[in-house]
């Protein structure tokens, strides 16, 4: 929060949360309705993560996640897409989900016997971190705010 303390006089807070070893796109807001829309499990907000695994991700496990029938801790997880990251080793996996459970991406891979060594949220609710360097931020445009409100 120190990074954005001079961005506004409003009280802002993160939408959702990251664990200590996760990085990437984090939205901050002063709007409780947007926060609720983006974090409530029933609202199906999609998130795309780049997961770096400790070893190669087997094709059979990729197919298991792609099947659409996958559970973690007895609860169904909705995986929209999963693929190897283009141009990277087979230990680099992109996974798109719309489940908001705590540490769910790490748990998905752990269920299959993989450890996530780095996790980066690349897209959240249609917003991308493209062209924003790590440790930097920007204000949303009016259009982006309206798009979030319409989700």
Label for each model-derived stretch:
Residues 1-151:
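Basic, flexible Lys/Arg- and Gly-enriched helix-loop patches that mediate nucleic-acid binding at interfaces
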């Amino acid at each position: 929060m120190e990074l954005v303390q001079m961005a506004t006089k409003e009280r802002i807070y993160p939408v959702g949360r990251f664990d200590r070893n996760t990085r990437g796109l984090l939205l901050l807001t002063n709007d409780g309705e947007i926060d609720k829309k983006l974090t409530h499990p029933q609202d199906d907000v999609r998130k795309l993560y780049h997961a770096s695994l400790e070893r190669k991700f087997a094709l059979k496990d990729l197919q298991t996640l792609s099947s659409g029938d996958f559970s973690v801790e007895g609860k169904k997880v909705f995986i929209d897409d999963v693929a190897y990251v283009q141009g990277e080793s087979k230990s680099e996996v992109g996974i798109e989900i719309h489940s908001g459970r705590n540490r769910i991406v790490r748990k998905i891979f752990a269920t299959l016997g993989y450890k996530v060594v780095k996790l980066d949220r690349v897209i959240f609710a249609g917003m991308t971190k493209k062209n924003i360097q790590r440790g930097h931020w920007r204000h949303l445009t009016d259009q982006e705010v309206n798009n979030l409100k319409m989700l």
